[in-house]
Amino acid sequence: MRLVLLGPPGAGKGTQAAILSEKFGVPHISTGDLFRANIGQATALGVEAKKYIDAGELVPSSITNDMVKARVAEPDAANGFLLDGFPRSVEQAQALEGILKDLDTRLDGVLSFVVDEDIVVERMLARGRADDTEDVIRNRLRVYRDETSPLFDYYKDSIVSVDAIGEVEEVNARALAALGK
C-alpha cells in the first residue's frame, strides 16, 4: 500500500498514519521526521537542509525530494509506505512520480483528510503550544491551502476524501472504508 496523505495541519494525518502504518505493516514517512533524522545523522542532505531551517527558510524541493527518494528505496518501504507532508506541490508530486517509476512502482492512492478550519483552530489551540496562536494557526492553514490546492487537481483520478471530524477510531474506520479495506 503506497499512499499519500493530504490534509491541513491539525487534521490528524499523523495520528491516522500511525494507525494505518501498523495495520498495513508499512512505514509512516513524514517530511518532518526525515528532516530531523537527516539533520541528526549529519547526512549531506541534512547538513544542507539545516542551513535553510536555521535561516527560517523553506527547505528547497530538490533536497526534500532526495530525502524522500532515499527513504522510499529502503527495504522496509519495499511493500509500501504512507507519505505525510509530501508532496506539497505539483512539482513535488511529479518528482514523486519519477521516484516511484525508477523503483518500478506507483501510488495506490491519495487520502485527503477533510476538516473545517474552525475545528482545526480549536484542536490546535487545545494542544496548548506557546507558538500556536489563532493568527499563526490560520496563517499555516492559508499557506497549506495555497501550496496544496493544485494537488487536488493533479491527483483528481486517485484522491479520496475522508471526513476527519470525530473520534480517532471513527476517522480511521472512514479511512479504511475509503481504501476499500
UniProtKB/Swiss-Prot annotation:
It comes from the Bacteria. The lineage of its organism: Bacteria, Bacillati, Actinomycetota, Actinomycetes, Mycobacteriales. GO terms for cellular component: cytoplasm. The keyword Nucleotide-binding applies. Belongs to the adenylate kinase family. ATP binds at residues 10-15, 127, 166. The gene is adk. It comes from Rhodococcus erythropolis (strain PR4 / NBRC 100887). This is Adenylate kinase. One of its GO terms (molecular function) is ATP binding.
